[in-house]
Structure formats: structure tokens, C-alpha cells
């Protein structure tokens, strides 16, 4: 007898996991306080770096302009603020990534590779992403969320390739996950010393992914 899927298994990653909030703000004023804290933290990360945020709670508190009580009502620590920032970044990216996939013509499977590479390159041009992901300034919580996010994206990429059936009938979610992990590492490499991304590395990433998926295409 087949095992029934649980409701939890059907949820996307950000519905199964939380960010860094101690509790969800309910009132409009509370939501404004949370947004104020997150905006200040993002600015501080970009201006002074990851270490400045987690190394001095006072520095972050001064930048936010909110009271200590209001801050700790929603966040246990500066690290949890960054957890929430990263959580929202990944959640927003998941939505816009899906929009990019949905907008493709669907005539050639190579379009999927182009969307992947172009999307990752554009994401890494964001200062916050470069400071946190490229420099690997991620908490253990965010690393776990990142794995969930990549697995989710792998499923979305597989769905796109399945539209070219039967050509990619042998392609699996694991294959797509491997490709995404490789692309993430190459994007980090491309943006380590170049805020616009080293075009040669980006081109090689495109070539590698094209050849990788071509190797999994049926005759």
C-alpha cells in the first residue's frame, strides 16, 4: 500500500521552516519595528561587514534606533537578525526565480541553463548576497535553510526539464541539486574579487551546466 504524503511534505521550504524571528509581529507598529531593524542590519552589513553586526549588539541597536526592549522582543541576538534577513532573501529569490522559469518560451532546454546562470549572476551583484554568501558569513541556521532552498529549486528545475519529455526522463532531482550546488560555488568564485562577476568564470559555469545536462539527455 503506498504511503500517503504528509501535509508537511507538500509545503515549500519556507512554509516548513522559520527565519530568525522570536515571534511574528501582529500589529502594524510591531511589523514596522521589525522592518526597521532588518533594514538597519542590511545597511550595516553592507557598510561595515558581517563581523560588525554580530560583534557589537550595541552598534546594531544604535543603527536601528529602536529600544533594547523592542529589539529583544523579536530577536534573541544580532545573529538571529541576520538569519531573518537571509530567510527573507531566499524566500523572495524563490518567488522571482519561479517567475523567471515561468516566463521562458519553453522551446529549447538550454533556456533553463541560461535562466539559472543569469539569475545567479544577478543575485550575486547584490551587496548583501556578496557579503553573506560569497564570503560565507552564514550561520548554521542559514546553511540549513540554504540546503532546503536548493532542494526546492532543484525540484523546480526538474519540472522545467520534464517539459521536454521524453528527452530528460532519466534526469532526477539529485542531478539538478548537484548542478545547483556547483553553480552556487562557481558564482561565489566569480564574485570573490569582482562585484560584477568575472565574465570568464560565468561563461565557464554556463558551459559546464550545458554539458552536464546534455549528458543526462536521452537520444
Range-by-range predicted roles:
Residues 31-42, 46, 74-98, 117:
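An amphipathic alpha-helix adjacent to DNA-recognition modules
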Residues 44-80:
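Helix-turn-helix
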Residues 84, 98-124:
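Hydrophobic alpha-helical connector segments
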Residues 1-51, 59:
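Basic, helix-initiating cap at the start of DNA-binding domains
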Residues 97-105, 131-137, 187-194:
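Secondary-structure edge/capping motif, primarily at the C-terminal ends of alpha-helices
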Residues 94-95, 118, 140-165, 173-177, ...:
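Amphipathic alpha-helical packing segments from all-alpha helical-bundle domains
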Residues 110-111, 125-155:
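Short secondary-structure transition hinges
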Residues 5, 10, 14, 119-122, ...:
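Hydrophobic alpha-helical segments that form the core
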Amino acid at each position: 500500500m503506498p504511503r500517503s504524503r504528509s501535509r508537511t511534505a507538500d509545503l515549500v521550504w519556507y512554509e516548513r521552516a522559520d527565519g530568525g524571528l522570536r515571534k511574528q509581529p501582529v500589529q502594524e507598529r510591531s511589523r514596522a519595528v521589525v522592518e526597521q531593524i532588518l533594514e538597519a542590519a542590511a545597511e550595516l552589513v553592507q557598510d561595515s561587514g558581517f563581523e560588525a553586526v554580530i560583534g557589537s549588539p550595541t552598534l546594531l541597536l544604535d543603527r536601528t534606533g529602536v529600544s533594547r526592549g523592542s529589539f529583544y522582543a523579536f530577536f534573541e541576538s544580532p545573529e538571529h537578525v541576520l538569519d531573518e534577513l537571509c530567510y527573507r532573501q531566499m524566500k523572495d529569490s524563490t518567488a522571482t526565480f519561479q517567475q523567471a522559469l515561468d516566463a521562458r518560451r519553453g522551446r529549447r532546454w538550454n533556456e533553463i541553463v541560461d535562466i539559472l546562470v543569469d539569475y545567479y549572476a544577478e543575485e550575486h551583484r547584490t551587496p548583501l548576497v556578496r557579503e553573506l554568501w560569497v564570503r560565507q558569513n552564514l550561520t548554521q541556521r542559514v546553511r540549513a535553510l540554504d540546503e532546503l532552498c536548493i532542494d526546492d529549486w532543484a525540484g523546480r528545475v526538474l519540472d522545467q526539464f520534464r517539459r521536454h519529455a521524453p528527452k530528460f526522463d532519466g534526469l532526477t532531482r539529485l542531478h539538478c541539486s548537484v548542478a545547483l550546488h556547483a553553480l552556487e560555488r562557481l558564482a561565489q568564485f566569480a564574485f570573490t574579487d569582482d562585484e560584477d562577476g568575472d565574465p570568464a568564470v560565468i561563461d565557464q559555469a554556463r558551459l559546464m551546466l550545458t554539458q552536464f545536462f546534455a549528458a543526462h539527455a536521452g537520444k
